[in-house]
Amino acid sequence: IWIGFGVAALAKGLERYGKLNPVIAGSVATVLCLFIPIQMAGQNWDDHDRSGRYVCRDFGSNYLESCEPNAIIFTNGDNDTFPLWYAQEVEGVRTDVRVCNTSYLQTDWYIDQMKKQAYESAPLPITWTRDQYIQGTRDAAYVFPLTKDSIDLNTALNFVRSDDPKFKKIPGINQELDYIPADKLYYKVDSVAGAKILGGKTDGMVDQMMINLAGKNALGKQELTILDMLQTNNFERPMYYAITVSPDQFVNLDGYFEQTGLAYQVVPKNANKAVNTDKMYDNVMNKFKWGGVDKPGVYIDENVMRMCKSYRMMLFNKLAEALVKEGKNDKALEVLDKCMQVLPPENVPLDYTALSTGELYYVLGQKEKAAEIFTGIADNMMRNINWYFRLNP
């Protein structure tokens, strides 16, 4: 609208002060103003050109490929949910995996969806009936420890889901509330199911998983539903959290997380977010796709750049470090080389996220590659410093 007003005003000015007839004045004004969008396109074309870049599709697929068949993966935000849905709904990628967004899991309509079949994914193992989770019912359960002892997870969930008034009364509080009478819960691990989910590697497997709720005022509906799934599932289906999920959604299960790629698998051992090198190596080296960020000339905006640098740290460096600790130096070197191949410095500049890359190269005896990385980091930092010093105080 304002551009149109500007053209009209310029035409009027030419007509009045240039003594031009209306047709010529309008034509001249139009031609002159055409240079404005041409200039805008010329200056902004490069940083709006997404040709050759398929990061959203491929990175979304990578989350799904981090999971075992028939898995459940919990996500939280838009960027770790919508790309996964696109990959499944449009590209048909890993439709056996059920994506469950914890933000939506606070609503009854979404829980209804999760209890239905979706493609090859069976309904989620949720035992709560609709009248027990309908909106306005059990939206939260307060953590009110009436005992210092830990109680069984199943007992705690049955306590919350009961409609018996005696389970709603807290000493000293007149109002009836949904609550959990302990801040320490435990889940008994079925040894057969636990061994199966660990692939027969039972070293370190625990007989019960402790869930410490100390410091939490309440559990939301989504957390109660996740705990119900943990109890009901009995490790029949692999359960994962996307690595981008906020820790406050973990229900304090992160001590039992094992990284397999872009996801943490819930396992019956004190993994503490350690890397499962076998699974993660296979995913990173053989299954993951890179969205074209490895191609010369592909424009990478600040959001994609941030994700790529996170990949460098959370995937490649972490996996290589774990492989070095296990004495698998050849594989660690392959991982580092893969990192430099798919996240080339021309597209993803070297900065603090590459420090560990250089250190690991040095540990592996690749001093020239290490020096090249450290030199690249230093050069980029000096360019930044010089640019800052050009600014007036």
Residue ranges and their predicted role:
Residues 1-70, 87-393:
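ER/secretory pathway lumenal C-terminal domains and tails of membrane proteins involved
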Residues 82-86:
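Phosphate- and divalent-cation-binding pockets in alpha/beta enzyme and binding domains
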